[in-house]
């Protein structure tokens, strides 16, 4: 609510208002530099906001950061893994961090690992994984957490078509289970299979929200226009603002 913040006292995002309901996936889209990553970093508590509120299930990030963060799982664009821990140890760390029932969590972990063809790699260290495999590990660990809010940053990078399909199925499953999902992406063709509501972030503010069809209408796109045309229009607006 009215989130304003950035880096070194410079506001990159200004009065951002965004609500995600249980059982809803929202896509945050916009040009590079529009403020998507900055918004996510504030949501994760990695940056201190200048103004506004971030509340999840009645818990304020500012007032109770520890409780807030236990309800959030994050899939970064660039995989972040501990080099000295095996895949199995990463999974066990998630179970410990989120206080999951050990037996139930391991049953779920095995399902997820099989889905992404990692079931025979539990003893592997991150150095043995390709970039795509590291991304799959991040997906597995984040969905294993069973958090109320899943924050996903550009998830399709490095994933093969089967992994993309499996990821989309997991997002749909999470939404059906009344979880909240916030996803940033440029790959709208795939994202629209799992996300019904999109918010366009432009010049640090939410310019419009709605389905992709509603966003097409807002920017005057023709039915025959590709999604690339949306980014061309956003770029033209940004250039005009800075002229």
Label each region the model flagged:
Residues 125-132:
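Conserved ABC ATPase signature
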Residues 209-210:
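ABC ATPase "signature
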Residues 161-163:
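Helix N-cap at the start of a conserved alpha-helix in ABC-type nucleotide-binding domains
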Residues 52-63, 67-68:
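Conserved ABC transporter NBD signature motif
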């Amino acid at each position: 609510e009215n989130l304003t913040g950035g880096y070194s006292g410079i506001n990159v995002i200004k009065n951002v208002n965004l609500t995600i309901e249980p059982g809803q996936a929202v896509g945050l889209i916009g040009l590079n530099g529009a403020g998507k990553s900055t918004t996510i970093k504030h949501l994760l508590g990695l940056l201190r906001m200048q103004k506004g509120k971030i509340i999840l299930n009645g818990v304020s990030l500012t007032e109770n950061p520890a409780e807030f963060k236990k309800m959030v799982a994050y899939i970064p664009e660039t995989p972040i893994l501990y080099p000295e821990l095996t895949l199995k140890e990463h999974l066990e760390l998630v179970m410990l961090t989120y206080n999951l029932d050990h037996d139930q969590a391991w049953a779920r972990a095995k399902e997820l690992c099989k889905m992404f063809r990692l079931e025979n790699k539990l003893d592997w260290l991150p150095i043995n994984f390709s970039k795509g495999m590291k991304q799959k590990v991040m997906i597995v660990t984040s969905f294993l957490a069973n958090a109320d809010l899943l924050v996903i940053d550009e998830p399709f990078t490095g994933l093969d078509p089967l992994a993309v399909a499996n990821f989309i199925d997991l997002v749909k499953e999470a939404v059906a289970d009344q979880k909240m999902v916030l996803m940033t992406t440029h790959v709208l063709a795939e994202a629209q299979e799992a996300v019904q509501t999109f918010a366009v972030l432009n010049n640090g503010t939410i310019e419009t929200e709605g389905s992709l069809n509603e966003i097409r209408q807002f920017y005057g796109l023709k039915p025959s226009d590709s999604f690339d045309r949306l980014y061309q229009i956003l770029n033209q607006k940004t250039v005009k603002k800075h002229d």
